[in-house]
């Protein structure tokens, strides 16, 4: 046992804290902490400061609760003061010093880095544990924006992904992943469209860019800059059968630099972007110069607003600290939408859950402006929807009962804007957090066509109900 393991074990015994409780607080599986205590293993060097700080806080809190500060000082040869903050600092320094001694005396030191910085995973359980548990924990410990490359085809993995348990924790630092996609490989029909959509929704705190990958699919690499690289062997079903893990930073970054050159702009098919970039590329101007639209709304309903709302949105833009260009954009979009609603064809897909939430809280996001409609404004909005849909019979509504989508209703966060020539996704949740993309723009004509076709087919799904002007009025009168 090394110095770090000895100290950690002694602290656990002194505080009598349960290993399961400690693991839950620190964010690591109990097997990892057990190995740190008994097997001479150490937390990853990059993660160690955060791990030690978390451990120190836990132990200090327990010592104060148990009123054992004086005994701790005698047992661990520590001096006062004995308040919780000071105890935490003392324990952190003890752990830090023990970690350094242990690191210098194990095969993880710099002299043996070439031998110890690689390992091979051969069993499915180990491979799954690495990607599902160990890798996310490692990314959570990083104190910097995370840049990741994955040369493999996302569509090859979609069929095996499960979202039943949901996410336990979301990233607080920006995570950006460049990933491969091959529409001619595992994406030969439209079945992958909802799977890809659910994937983006499930990881809506991560920004993805997808690149056509036929030229690099053979590499089978997953690389986290400044951290770790994984070279994978895939079986005939595109499942990872062997994972070769590299943690030597120099090797990892050499791989990253070489592989990153394969992700060229000409191969970009789906791109995460912010509001400024979306506007620059015409998604808030030329996008509306068409006459056919498919719009799937995942939050509120910012369309068919009564005229008196537009000045209030403009004022809200100013009140929320946007510059005058946002107020001008809101004014322009208001006029543009009024013209579109008069005669163009619009298919609105509205989630039942989001519709009920809008009726309850009235929140909409118009462009980038968050606005809460009052009950009276919501009533005017509904009346205006009825009036405009009667005036323009090309406006159709499809209510998607997302409660019938087993384990999927918590996974629909992105709204879809499509004119069959250009398509982008909007992430309403991003306006309430600090990570994740605001938008995805779809740059592949083939992908736009397939998504358009999928939305057309969605109209005939059992969980999708059609409402034209008359049935909408009947529904309103009833409820």
Range-by-range predicted roles:
Residues 17-20, 53, 209:
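Intrinsically disordered, low-complexity, charge-biased terminal/linker regions in eukaryotic proteins
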Residues 473-479:
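Hinge/cleft segment of the Venus flytrap/periplasmic-binding protein
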Residues 1, 35, 45-112:
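Short amphipathic recognition helices of helix-turn-helix/homeodomain-type DNA-binding modules
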Residues 119-464:
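Hydrophobic protein-protein interaction segments
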Residues 27-46:
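Recognition helix of helix-turn-helix/homeodomain-like DNA-binding domains
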Residues 12, 36-40, 59:
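DNA major-groove recognition helix of helix-turn-helix
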Residues 1-19, 25:
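A short, Lys/Arg-rich alpha-helix, primarily the initiator
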